[in-house]
Every structure is written in structure tokens, then in C-alpha cells.
């Protein structure tokens, strides 16, 4: 075969092989990075006159990258190559001259051989055009030029790689073409042949499946008019790569593409080719088969809150199911069955066409997680003797997206984006959308007590920053749809109703009626001859949208959406249940976005019960949330009523009403939670009632700006009722943790009444740095009727008013309290006023008025004046801790034996912390100790037993405590002195340094014992031998029974260093045992010592003395021995009294007082005893 014929045959065979049409699926991409215009051009070294390497498909596919990379440029949209060397017959070029002054350095063309660089960076090009004669122009030489995309290289011998993404504007077949190739070129389209998605800058892949194969055979003519076709889907990015090699001289590569509508694009690919930075971590960047996400139905966009659809042989169904009676479950689903199209709720994260209907949302996002859950839990309690607490919760549509994009506005590059119902469409970064709903619906059946019911509904809250919501559609978008929670369309006299009902089962045989009141909310839309149509072009076979309800075209139609709630009731119960339902709403808060979706239902429930149960426990909780907007006035109120009945005719009614009015700049959120727990045990047969109630009202305020704050200190109220036929002790303790200030007043009231009594102490503080006014009123009313017919009523009211001006810098709140006690025989009124001050950036004044009234028909009332202690310090935020330890002491007298019965005191600790938030929050822990005297007057019960007959006697007593500290060893002595047989006269100063107390002397003779109460003087002596400290105490009875009791409290305050943790103060409990020869006398008392922790540590020492004119010889001595190194907390005081040993002890005490040398003899005497 001649050579020419052979070449013709090979050329024809090659043309047949390269004229291919891509019939397979082309892989597309969806890069999420920043889109850049144009393609990236990389330059690689190629050997001059190498006419074989570029003929290898492997080299053209990936082998070129093994050579030296010369450089790269980006942003190129003109892809064709047409280079000519500077010789006759070629294109005009500019020669280089050292004398030229015109600068054309941007497009140098240097007609010199490789290696001969006549034009340096400092030289310029000539302004005139010159051509070299063929004799002077070597066509086989390498010439330097910037003709190729402005990159200075040798176009005569170079390999060029062009990479980028091709974005088809329409779906269809795209035909790429090379009109001619000199020397060799290929074109690849698709993520599986050009380069991997999101990896444009990575080394080339090894695929040789070229869309256009323009490789020039060795020693053959350059191929011409080479074409390659591929099917593309609009809106996807397709990787495209062009590799061109030139071995010598001229270089030519014209690039073109024909669009599906017949439009031909040559050379300039502006708007079609783009580049993205590599992102290997992006999930679902590649779309292997875009055809799976294609849709033959085309829809036009609809406006918000309405939709219209026109389908060709399309059926849309919507179903709603309800399951009753006890467990309610509802599902919202919407499906469309169309000819030539299918729409489902399942989505693939790797597809741009994502659709969803009903209560879920759909969007195109990357790394998106969407969850939706609906649960109804309805417990059922029957045949119960106690109230049932029921809680049900509902959560719906929780969506969390990270760097996701959801939009209803589509550009020409988006093939399909849809969104439907219950969710909004916006463009946001790191946006979190959450929608939750909760239902609380109690149900109690066959119960003997009323049920406490609370219902609440919380709706979505979405906060977006710089969100954009749009529903506009570009005409180039093939499919964009949106739907919402309702629709009104065009049809003929049709009625569309969508309802949701929740029905709670019932129980018959009810002995009490249930009162039910509920508010019903519904939204209805009535159109009178209204027509809403959606224009559709003839090329639109299908327009669809889905939402909560179906979409139709109607005239004179009525659309109603209603939701009814049938609340539970109490049946077979001895009490009626009152139910009240209310409706409130809330809305989203967005920055630069408009979107409102709010539904909130709040269902408070109040109940009262009447029963004959011996014991009853009731619990009521109220939750209130208020929002104060800028320059607005908001008022709220809280009321609760609790009624209790037991088998004894005792009733208690407590009402609490408060009103808060604020006018302030800024937003203030206040959350108030109030809880009341009441326990009423059954009355014993001796008509002794013990009742306790605790009311805690923690109130926390949170301000959105640092200059506005509301602080109300919590208050704890403790009351103890002990009505009996004998004396009764009533103790009321009020404690209030501090927030802004640490100075506070503590008031304690002790009252003795014939039937019952109550004392309430409430401390509150309101501080607002900016101008405001606030008022609060609290009313407490209680009535107790015991079985003996006596009635006690208590009425107290508290008024708090506060005002503030930001002009001053000092705050002086004033607290005043008034109390009045009236009875049939005694009327006592007392008034106390205390004030404190602290420094703050604004000025506020607070007035608190507390008035209380007690009325009882019998028994005189004795009142002990309250003791108040004030501490003053200032800090911005404080955590306060309190620790209280109580101890019980008992003394017993046993005949002819010695016994010790220690009792351990109960330890109670209470720690409360509170904080105030400003620009910054600094938390300090302060420790404080309130000075308190050890002198206590209480009631004790004296049990006397004789001849197997015991009698109890209630008598008031004086508690005296003596403390001795020697070398770090502390000895504490406590004495309870009954006052029933004596008359006390209180004096203001200490008359004697000796300690005087009352003692009981038991004398036994011939089996008959007698007791005599006599005052005594306590003398204490201390001796130390071999590091052993011995303390001797002597009681000297006096002859007179008329005592003058004096007390003196010496407070010694020492400044202690600041400690981060709160200091702890404990009271030590000791047991004293008296062992006489015969007879039994036991003294029981209960003493509680409370100490507060603060920065200042106060050491309190108290001494008690009784003065008398006559002094007798000492008869009772107590001895305590402790090693010097023993800590005070481990010391246990012992006291022994006996008439038989009085002479020994008297001698020992005499020896100790006369001479220190007699200590050894005294020790021997004590050892004998």
C-alpha cells in the first residue's frame, strides 16, 4: 500500500473513532465553595520537535503532569489558541530594540531562538511592525511569547492544561467541537473523566475516556472538525478539562460548543465556565447520576400562604389520622401521585432537587440534619385514692443545619428547589430552627381527691442573623414551588375543612360534676367569588405544591382550620374540678429577616378539694413568664388559693396577689416560679396539733442590657403550730439569701399563746439601675379552729413600693414593720424600724410595710422583744452560705446508780446562692457570723418519779452557758434553771463576777427523798499538771429564793482574713449527769443555736450571774479534766453531784484556792471519789 494511501486509511479510521456521542451518564458536581469566573490554565514543559509523546493517550490524559510545571494563570474564559511565529507569512509581530521607548511589556512577542533572550525585563518593544524574512526566521526554533493567556513562555513547545466547571443553563445535549488541532488536544467532560468533584487542583486522574480525542497521529495531518456530545442537566456543575500540546512552530486550537437550543458558542465561554477551590471534606459533592433527580413536571412559583396546582392526570391525597381514647397520635402526610412525575417526602442529600411536604421542611443544604418527632403520652389512672399528676409533651420539627442554604428563590443555575409547610425558607449560615409543642393534660378517675392540672404550649422560636427569605422566581427556573399551612384556590362551591381533635376517655358513675371552660380558637377563610389562578406556559405539563391541606380552584368556598381540645375531668370523686383554658401566642425574633410562626397555648388549672381523709398532701405550682419590651408597660399578677380540710375543724386559706409595673428602656425577661407545700397530719386525741408549712418564692430576673435589672430576694417562711393545754413554744425563722447587697436584717419573734400562733418574716429587695416604679402587695390570711372550740385568726399584709432616679449614687432603702396582737385579755402592739444603705451607681428607695394581726379568745400572750442584728458590706455579686447546727441537752437524775444518755443534735444546713448579672459577673463568697448570746429562755418539761408514779411539769427555765479556754482547750458548761418557783428580775448589768444559777438539791433520808430548788453561785478553779488541765466547778446554794438575774454579753469581734469558702460555726452539745442517792428528776430541753457565716468572725462569750445577799458553803462541785492538746470540739463536759462527796470536794476546792502545792493531794481526793 502506498504511503499516502496508508495515511488516508489511518486518518479515516481515526476520525471514525473520535466522532463519538456520549451515551453514558455523565457525573455532575455540586461544589459549595465560592464560585470564581473562568478556568485555570497550567503550563508544563514540552520538548521542542517531539512529535511522538503527544500521540500517546496516556500522556494527554495524565502523563503531562510528570514534566516540569512552568506556572499557571486563572480566570480565563477565552479558551481558543491561535499562535504564529514572527516570520513572513505569519501574523504581525513586534520586534525588540534597545532604542525603543514604547512599552508593550504586557504582550511581548520575541522572534528569537530559545536561549537567546534579547528582550530583558528592562527593554521595550518597538511600536512598528516588522517581519523577518524566511532566511532570517528559523521555523524550527523555540520562540518566547506571552500570547498564550498572557503567560510568558514558549508557545512553540509547551503543554497547556485547562480545568474548570461547565454550568449548563438548560437540560439537553451539548456538543463540543475542535475545528482543527495543531498539534494535539483532548477534551473531557464529567467528574469521572476530567477530574474528581471538588478536587480541581489535584493531580489529573488516569481516565482516557475522552469526550473529544484530538490526538494527532505521528507524521499525519492534523484532525479537523472533531466533535463530542454529552447530555447535561441544568443547574449542575460538570468538570471539564482541555489538554493541548504544541511541539514546534505554530499552534492552533479553536474551541466551541453547541447548546440544546442550537445556539453556538465560540472561543468566549463567559458565563459557562467557573472554578472552585478544592474542598475534599465536603460531603455529597458529586452527583453520579443526575437523571435520578430529574423531574419531567414543571411548576410555576406560588405566593406565600397559598398555593394553586394544575396537574395532568395527577391525584393529590392528604390524610390525617387520630388514635383515641387514651393515647393520641397524629400524623400529617401529603403525597402526590402524578402521571410522569412522582413527589415523595424522602430526600437525598446529594441531589439539588429536594422536596418535602406537610410538617417537615425541605431545602438544599450541605451537612444538614433534619429530624421530626411527634409524641402524645396520655397516662390513665383509675380507682386511685390520691391525685394523679399527668404530663404530656409534644415536640415537632426540629431542624439543625450547618452551613446550609435553603431558599425559595432560584437563579438560572438552579434546576429545582422546593419548600413546603410549617417551615420557612431562608438563606442563612449556621442557622438553627426548632419548633416544639408541649401538651400537659392530666386525667384522674375514681379519685378521692382533686387533681392538679397544668397545661402549657410552647411554640417555635427561630433566631437568624441576616437571613433572607424570598419567594421570587427567575423565568429561567424550570421548577420552583412553595407551599404553606393553608390554601385557597379556585373551585365551584366546595368546602374544605381540616380539623384536629383530641378526645379524652370518660368514666361513668361520677358523684361530682366537672366544670369545664375552654377557649376555642379557629381560623377560617371565606372567599366570595374569588379566583386565584396560576399562569402556566404551554411547556409546563405539571405545576404542584403541597401543604397542610389540599389545593383546589374554587368559587364561593369556605376553608376552615380548627383545633379542639376536650379536657379531662374527675369522675367518682368527692371534689369538683374546675378547669380554665386560655390562649396566648409568641413570635420569632430575627435580625434582618421577616418570618412569623407562632402558636402558644397556656392552660392554668386551679382546683379545690374537700375530703374526710385523715391526712392530705397538696402541692400547687405556678409558673409565669413575662416579657417587657422597650418603652412599654407590662403588668402581671399571680394568684393562688389552697383550701384544706381535715377531720378536725381546721381551715386555712392563703391568697397571694402581686402586681409589678415597669417602664424601662431595654428588654427585661422575668421568670417567676412559686411553689407551696402543705402537710397537715391527723389530730391526736390529746388535741395537740403540729403543723408546718414552707413557702419558698425564688424569683430570678434576667436583663438584656446591663443597665436594667430586677432583683427580688427569695423568702423562706417557716411556721410551727403546737396548740395544747400546756405551755407552747413557737419559733419562726426567716432567712433570705442576698444578691446585690449583703446587709440585711434578721428578726425573730417568740410568742406564747393558749391555742396556736404563727409568725411570718419576709424580706424583699428590688433594685433597678434606671428609672422605674414598682409596687407589690401580699396578703396572708389564715384561720385555725381546734377541736376545743378556740379559734385563732391571723391577718398580715405587706406592701412594697420602690422608686429610683439615676441622678444620685446612693441607695437608702427603709424597711418598716408593724405587728399587732389582740386577745381577750391582753393587747400588745410593737413597731420596729430598721434601715440600711449600700453604694450603687443609681439611687433607689424601697418601702416595705408589713402588718400582721393575731386574734385568740383565751390565754394571755407574752411576747419577747425581737432581736435584730445588721451587717453591712457591699459587693456586686455575692454567694451566701448558711450552716445551722442544733443540739439537744438532757439531764437525768437516777437513784443509786449513774447513767449517761447522750443525745445527738440534728444538723441542718442551708446554702443558697444568687447572682446579679451586669456587663460582667464577678462572684465572691462572703462569710458572716451573726453575734448571738448564749442566754436562752425556754420551756422545759421536768419529769418527777416517786413510788413508780411519774409526773411531768412544764416550767420556764434560764439557760446559762459558761465557756473556759485555757491553752487552746475549751470547756463549756450549760445549765438549765427552772423558774417555776422563783421570780426573776432582769437587770441590765453584771453585778457579780461569780456565776449564779439555780440548782436542785435532792435530799434522801430513810427512803424518802425531797427536792429543793435554790440559787447557787458557781465558782471555777483550774489546775494544770503535766499538761493535763483540771477544771473544778463549785455550786454554792444561797438562802433566799428571790433572785436578781443579770446578764452581760460581751462581744469580741476580730477581723479575720478573707476566705473564699464560707466559715463554719458549730455548737457543741454536752450531757450533764447528776447521780444522787435516791429519787429521780429529769430535765429535758431543746436548744437551737443558729450562726450565720460572714467575712467578720465574731467570738461571743456570755456569762450569767444571779446576785444574792447571803452565800453558803459550797456543796456541789463538778470536775472536768482534759489534756491541753485536746481540741474544743472533742471535749465532753461531765458534771457529778452527790451529797456524800461534798465534804471531799469542799476540802479539795479549799486546797486548790489556798496553795498550788496541794494540787497533788486534791487529785488523790478526787481519785477516791
Curated annotation (Swiss-Prot):
Residues 384-608 are annotated as: 4 X 36 AA approximate repeats, Ser/Thr-rich. InterPro entries: Flocculin_t3_rpt (IPR025928), PA14/GLEYA (IPR037524), PA14_dom (IPR011658). Its main location: secreted. It is a lipid-anchor; GPI-anchor. Residues 1-24 form the signal peptide. Extensively O-glycosylated. Residues 798-837, 856-920, 1070-1107 are annotated as: Disordered. Residues 303-572 are annotated as: 6 X 27 AA approximate repeats, Ser/Thr-rich. It comes from the Eukaryota. Keywords: Cell wall, Glycoprotein, GPI-anchor, Lipoprotein, Membrane, Repeat, Secreted, Signal. A lipid is attached at residue 1146 (GPI-anchor amidated glycine). It is found in: Secreted, Cell wall; Membrane. The number of the intragenic tandem repeats varies between different S.cerevisiae strains. There is a linear correlation between protein size and the extend of adhesion: the more repeats, the stronger the adhesion properties and the greater the fraction of flocculating cells. Belongs to the flocculin family. Cell wall protein that participates directly in adhesive cell-cell interactions during yeast flocculation, a reversible, asexual and Ca(2+)-dependent process in which cells adhere to form aggregates (flocs) consisting of thousands of cells. The lectin-like protein sticks out of the cell wall of flocculent cells and selectively binds mannose residues in the cell walls of adjacent cells. Activity is inhibited by mannose, glucose, maltose and sucrose. Also involved in cell-substrate adhesion, haploid invasive growth and diploid pseudohyphae formation. This is Flocculation protein FLO10. The gene is FLO10.
